[in-house]
């Protein structure tokens, strides 16, 4: 409502918001969980956020009415009492009146004047009472020969007659602009007095509002220089923000308050953050030493009205010059249906309660700036990323203070950069939190595998480490396992009874107030347990997390009561806000954040499976075949994306080439072949460093390769490449490249890919410019297509060069842009940029060049004169005179080809899919361990029972299969298989056990496909003991046999496994088994593409192909070999393997 932040600023948009329905005000946050929790999580969050906003609109309106009534009756307004939560409904008319009062109050601040104008006719529709005096126009002016005194000022007057001719031209030009705000400020002079003003324009529903702020100089050139100087200061502050170490939001906020105070000179500057429950907190502060600190102060949500927050996303800067000054009335045409909308005006007067609040805290002036970050993608409209008001940067001064518009504009740029930097930090923090939660979940899963479910509360880490809480508990099989601050066992049983009685159909519940959630025993728990999150594991087993009341977490350096503040709790003041906040959160905990609930829900799903396994430990676990289908689908998707990316790279108009780990070319597209004159077949295998680049680039390329092979990727590096063939005559080609580490799907670096941009033409221009300054104009304006688009600025960022290529690219002629400000006028009004963030980034690049810091290949996009989207890379270099002084900036554009954009997009998509599949693979490997543990446990139980020989054989076969699966899961190391460095674990084993395990793995598929299995296996081989890696042999043979079964004709077909052993005696006494395995089926057998995948070393196309390829390589490591043979009526795998026979078997032989 009234806030120390001065954020009374905003209100509703020009077309009033529909009055929200008057719901019951209920600020506790209680949510039920269901099985579809994750699917609708973001939608639920949005609905919850909207309902909270509607509730706050209603409460804002109620408080506004109480304040107004207290003024009329002469009673004091007791803020801390009025803000207490109430279920009182608010009439719709009262809400409408509140919104109208804030939006169309009819008064402005007296430090400037306001005129509203009908857009087509320039006719005055409304004006502030002080406009005449400020412009120097008096009603008593006596007509004279000097027409300067003939200006008439009244409703219906053409506003152009009030200003000089040049000012009228500027107004006409601004009125015709598509985005009028980008023209601000307009430098205009009163026709009568000659006084200069900043004209700040914005459109409303009935016309254009012009805020007139007196300027401090009469020379517009000095004004431009002052604006540029303000921008330079802002850019310096932005550079400081960008140079900060990552991962520290507090440091970022501390730095921005220092920068803003240095820029503006206010006595106090704060960063005010909005929490998820809409209340606010001062998280950073810099101030005059004698002022009371506000760091750590929390405000109730109603301190910043919802209407104000909404408009802060459109109107990002709000200044109050003097809260004690009398507001100036706005006079308007009677034909207007409703009072003039002032929400976008820089002059709008503060509301009475806000002025009173500022006066009570000893603040006279304020400047408030919005901090905007990206919201949830789901909230965006029309494909655009939504924006969220994260908080405010608030400036206070103990005396009247007015900041000129150029400096406010520079501060707004600083806020945009702060928002971008903050957004990155928050994303990194969220990712870090997610990793920590995943790590904790993994450790908890390992505990469940090694121990009973109670391990998650008896060992470290425990469930308390999963989310921030004061206590946690597990209720399992009627036993209570508490940790930290928790209810007693009797109380927890009572809570469970309440949950089952009122929330049985849900899978969980979270609340910040058990009392408001309806639990009747909440009072007996006291402040120690206010908030609770519970996850139902089974009908009788539960997980709990508990939080104490919020006030326990709140610390404020200024909260100490001063004896002289006798009315501290009643008057509107930061102390009463803090008291009101503590009243609001009484018996409440901090709310449970969405990320925390996601972590709880994930653990809930894991525990359900674990508890089921514990309950059914004697049953055999079966792996869900859908996992295999999911992997296959993912592989197919990746394969499709990979093929499309290869096609795009081959046909791209940008040079793209790749090398292996030895730096030799293994990829060379058509464009780089065209530039260098070197055909792809000749380029393959050449050394990039020794054969393809000039000597002066060898060291650069060598470093690029070395870093990229370590996973450290560099961007925008220029290399000088050789050319070949008689047409090129050993000329140089200059390419700016990005080095990308090429990784296989196990995330190991296997080479480097270079995506480049040919800058030979630009290099020629730059060299000629440096060496032959006299040829400057001839070079820049040469229509030769090799000359890139070029524009330049003076040291005030005004455009002074715009070459032929820029005219052709943008559709704007040189005459249209010369002399205009590059930021705002040229790029902004003429060539529209996408959003204020793009303008901020362009301004930073331009000012960096003016400061001597060049920028290479900055992504830059805009709309040309005809609305066509242009994407380019911007290179900005300083311009210097003969004495070496910087006098402006040179800018070059490199146009991005659609093919390259598409190729890069496909590459990013492939990397995204690869990462997703890697996560799925890691999840599957982790998930499979649990049922395998069950199988192992079942086998151990069966071993202790009386079994027949046949049953023992079945058990041995099951154990062999289980060990094979564990081996594959633990040793997912494809790189070592590829390069032949896989370590084999050899030992003695019976060959018959291996054959039994191999056959068992295809029996289900044989039955499903109605196939007959023919075994031609000599009896003596089953008892033969040999030496080797049993599990790898088992893996290889089962993979070959399984593929034969898959492609055998069905139904009523057959599959044969034939083993032919031969014993060979070696001279030194060693006995070798020479075993031939044939896996046979009739018909056409495996598809040729699959066999090609199996024997192809360069890659794989399908899941089966990868498996066969890996099996062939593992077999080769064991000195074996495999062939696939097609005969007239049948096909088969022919596997040869030699294994040493152990002494035990040698004696039998």
Swiss-Prot record:
This is Phytochrome B-2. It comes from the Eukaryota. Residues 641-712, 775-846 form the PAS domain. Disulfide bonds: none annotated. Residues 1-48 are annotated as: Disordered. Residues 13-24 have a biased composition (Pro residues). Contains one covalently linked phytochromobilin chromophore. Belongs to the phytochrome family. Pfam families: GAF, HATPase_c, HisKA, PAS, PAS_2, PHY. It comes from Glycine max (Soybean). Heterodimer between subunit A and subunit B. One of its GO terms (biological process) is detection of visible light. GO terms for molecular function: phosphorelay sensor kinase activity; photoreceptor activity; protein homodimerization activity.
């Amino acid at each position: 409502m009234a806030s120390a932040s001065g954020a009374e600023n905003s209100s509703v948009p020009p077309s009033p918001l529909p009055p929200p329905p008057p719901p019951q005000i209920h600020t506790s946050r209680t949510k039920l969980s269901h099985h579809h929790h994750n699917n609708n999580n973001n939608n639920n969050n949005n609905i919850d956020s909207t309902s909270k906003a509607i509730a706050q609109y209603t409460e804002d309106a109620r408080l506004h009415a109480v304040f107004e009534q207290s003024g009329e009756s002469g009673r004091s307004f007791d803020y801390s009492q009025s803000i207490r939560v109430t279920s009182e409904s608010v009439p719709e008319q009262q809400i409408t009146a509140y919104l109208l009062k804030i939006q169309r109050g009819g008064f402005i601040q007296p430090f400037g004047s306001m005129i509203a104008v009908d857009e087509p006719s320039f006719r005055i529709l409304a004006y502030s009472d002080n406009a005449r005096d400020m412009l120097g126009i008096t009603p008593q002016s006596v007509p004279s020969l000097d027409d300067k005194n003939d200006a008439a000022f009244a409703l219906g007057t053409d506003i152009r007659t009030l200003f000089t001719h040049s000012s009228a031209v500027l107004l006409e030009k601004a009125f015709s602009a598509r985005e009028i705000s980008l023209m601000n400020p307009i430098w205009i002079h009163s026709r009568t007095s000659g006084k200069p003003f900043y004209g700040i324009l914005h459109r409303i529903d009935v016309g254009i509002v012009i805020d007139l702020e007196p300027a401090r100089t009469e020379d517009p050139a000095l004004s431009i220089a002052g604006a540029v100087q303000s921008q330079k200061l802002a850019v310096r502050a932005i550079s400081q923000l960008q140079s900060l170490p990552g991962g520290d939001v507090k440091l970022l906020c501390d730095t921005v308050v220092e920068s803003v105070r240095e820029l503006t000179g206010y006595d106090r500057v704060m960063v005010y953050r909005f929490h998820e429950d809409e209340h606010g907190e001062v998280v950073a502060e810099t101030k005059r030493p004698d002022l009371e600190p506000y760091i750590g102060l929390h405000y109730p949500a109603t301190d910043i009205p919802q209407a104000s927050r909404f408009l802060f996303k459109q109107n990002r800067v709000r200044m109050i010059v003097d809260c004690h000054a009398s507001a100036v009335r706005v006079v308007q045409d009677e034909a207007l249906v409703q009072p003039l909308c002032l929400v976008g005006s820089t002059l709008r007067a503060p509301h009475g309660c806000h002025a009173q609040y500022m006066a009570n805290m000893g603040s006279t002036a304020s400047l408030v700036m919005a901090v905007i970050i990206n919201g949830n993608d789901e909230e965006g409209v029309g494909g655009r990323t939504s924006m969220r008001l994260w908080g405010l940067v608030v400036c206070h001064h103990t005396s009247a203070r007015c900041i000129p518009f150029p400096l406010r504009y520079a501060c707004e740029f600083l806020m945009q950069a702060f928002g971008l930097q903050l957004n990155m930090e928050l994303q990194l923090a969220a990712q870090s939190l997610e990793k920590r939660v995943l790590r904790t979940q993994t450790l908890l899963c390992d505990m469940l595998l090694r121990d009973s479910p109670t391990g998650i509360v008896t060992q470290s880490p425990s469930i308390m480490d999963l989310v921030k809480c004061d206590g946690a508990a597990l209720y399992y099989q009627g036993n209570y396992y508490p940790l930290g601050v928790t209810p007693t066992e009797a109380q927890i049983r009572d809570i469970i009874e309440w949950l089952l009685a009122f929330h049985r159909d849900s899978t969980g519940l979270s609340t910040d107030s058990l009392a408001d959630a309806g639990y009747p025993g909440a009072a007996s728990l006291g402040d120690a347990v206010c908030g609770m999150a519970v996850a139902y594991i089974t009908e009788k087993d539960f997980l709990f997390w508990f939080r104490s009341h919020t006030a326990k977490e709140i610390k404020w350096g200024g909260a100490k009561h001063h004896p002289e503040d006798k009315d501290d709790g009643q008057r509107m003041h930061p102390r009463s806000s803090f008291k009101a906040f503590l009243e609001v959160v009484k018996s409440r905990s901090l709310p449970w954040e969405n990320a925390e609930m996601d972590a709880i829900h994930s653990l809930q799903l894991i525990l359900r499976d674990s508890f089921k396994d514990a309950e059914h430990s004697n049953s055999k676990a079966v792996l869900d075949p859908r996992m295999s289908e999911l992997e296959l689908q993912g592989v197919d998707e990746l394969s499709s994306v990979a093929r499309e990316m290869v096609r795009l790279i081959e046909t791209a108009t940008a040079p793209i080439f790749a090398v292996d780990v030895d730096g030799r070319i293994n990829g060379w597209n058509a464009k780089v072949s065209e530039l260098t004159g070197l055909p792809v077949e000749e380029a393959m295998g050449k050394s990039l460093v020794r054969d393809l680049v000039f000597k002066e680039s060898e060291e650069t390329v060598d470093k690029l390769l070395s870093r990229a092979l370590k996973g450290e990727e560099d961007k925008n590096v220029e290399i000088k490449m050789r050319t070949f063939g008689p047409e090129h005559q050993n000329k140089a080609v200059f390419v700016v490249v990005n080095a990308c580490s090429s990784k296989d799907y196990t995330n190991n670096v296997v080479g480097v890919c270079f995506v480049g941009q040919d800058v030979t033409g630009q290099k020629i221009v730059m060299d000629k410019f440096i060496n032959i300054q006299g040829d400057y104009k001839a070079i820049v304006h040469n229509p030769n297509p090799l000359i890139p688009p070029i524009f330049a600025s003076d040291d005030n960022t005004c455009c002074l060069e715009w070459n032929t290529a820029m005219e052709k690219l943008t559709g704007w002629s040189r005459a249209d842009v010369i002399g205009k400000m590059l930021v705002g006028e040229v790029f902004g009004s003429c060539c529209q940029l996408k959003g204020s963030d793009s303008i901020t980034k362009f301004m930073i690049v331009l000012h960096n060049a003016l400061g001597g810091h060049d920028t290479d290949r900055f992504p830059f996009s805009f709309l040309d004169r005809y609305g066509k989207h242009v994407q380019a890379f911007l290179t900005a270099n300083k311009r210097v005179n003969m004495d070496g002084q910087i006098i402006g900036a040179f800018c070059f554009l490199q146009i991005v080809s659609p093919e390259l954009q598409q190729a890069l997009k496909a590459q990013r998509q492939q990397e995204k899919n690869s990462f997703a599949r890697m996560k799925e693979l890691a999840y599957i490997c982790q998930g499979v361990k649990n049922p395998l543990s069950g199988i192992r446990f079942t086998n151990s139980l069966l071993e202790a029972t009386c079994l027949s020989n046949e049953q023992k054989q079945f058990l041995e076969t099951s154990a062999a299969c289980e060990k094979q699966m564990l081996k594959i899961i633990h040793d997912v190391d494809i790189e070592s298989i590829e390069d032949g460095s896989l370590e084999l674990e050899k030992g003695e084993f019976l060959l018959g056990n291996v054959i039994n395990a191999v056959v068992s793995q295809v029996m289900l598929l044989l039955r499903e496909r109605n196939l007959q299995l023919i075994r031609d296996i000599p009896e003596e081989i089953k008892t033969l003991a040999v030496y080797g890696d049993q599990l790898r042999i088992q893996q290889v043979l089962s993979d070959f046999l399984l593929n034969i079964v898959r492609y055998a004709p069905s139904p009523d077909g057959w599959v044969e496994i034939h083993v032919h052993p031969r014993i060979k005696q070696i001279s030194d006494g060693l006995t070798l088994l020479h075993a031939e395995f044939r896996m046979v089926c009739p018909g056409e057998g495996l598809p040729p593409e699959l066999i090609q995948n199996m024997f192809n070393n360069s890659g794989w196309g399908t899941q089966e192909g990868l498996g066969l390829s890996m099996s062939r390589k593992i077999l080769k490591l064991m000195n074996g070999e495999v062939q696939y043979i097609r005969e007239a009526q049948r096909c088969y795998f022919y596997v040869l393997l030699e294994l040493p026979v152990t002494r035990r078997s040698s004696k039998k032989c």
